[in-house]
Amino acid sequence: MAKKSMVEREKKRERLVQKYAAKRAALNEIIHDQSLPMEERFKASLKLAELPRNSSATRLHNRCQLTGRPHAYYRKLKLSRIMLRELGSFGQIPGMVKSSW
């Protein structure tokens, strides 16, 4: 199980990303719009740089919802391989059955 502080840090980052997503998108639109004057685009890039670093989506790291494990993460289920196997063995994931041939 991951440290609680790491899990909480990741949750804080997720909240920041959601909070600043619209503002970031608007500033990026201005920065990449070639029809606007260079000065206006530069001001937008400075405003983007003033936003918190943790508000960038690239700072997020996928973690297991149950354990907080950052490695071997299955995006569809939001679980690590260990919890996927454990819950699958107990039949707690709908449609998942143990393989036998």
Curated annotation (Swiss-Prot):
Keywords: Ribonucleoprotein, Ribosomal protein, RNA-binding, rRNA-binding. Pfam families: Ribosomal_S14. One of its GO terms (biological process) is translation. PROSITE patterns: RIBOSOMAL_S14. Transmembrane segments: none annotated. The keyword Membrane does not apply. GO terms for cellular component: cytoplasm; small ribosomal subunit. PANTHER family: 30S RIBOSOMAL PROTEIN S14, SMALL RIBOSOMAL SUBUNIT PROTEIN US14M. Binds 16S rRNA, required for the assembly of 30S particles and may also be responsible for determining the conformation of the 16S rRNA at the A site. Part of the 30S ribosomal subunit. Contacts proteins S3 and S10. Belongs to the universal ribosomal protein uS14 family. This is Small ribosomal subunit protein uS14. It comes from Paracoccus denitrificans (strain Pd 1222).
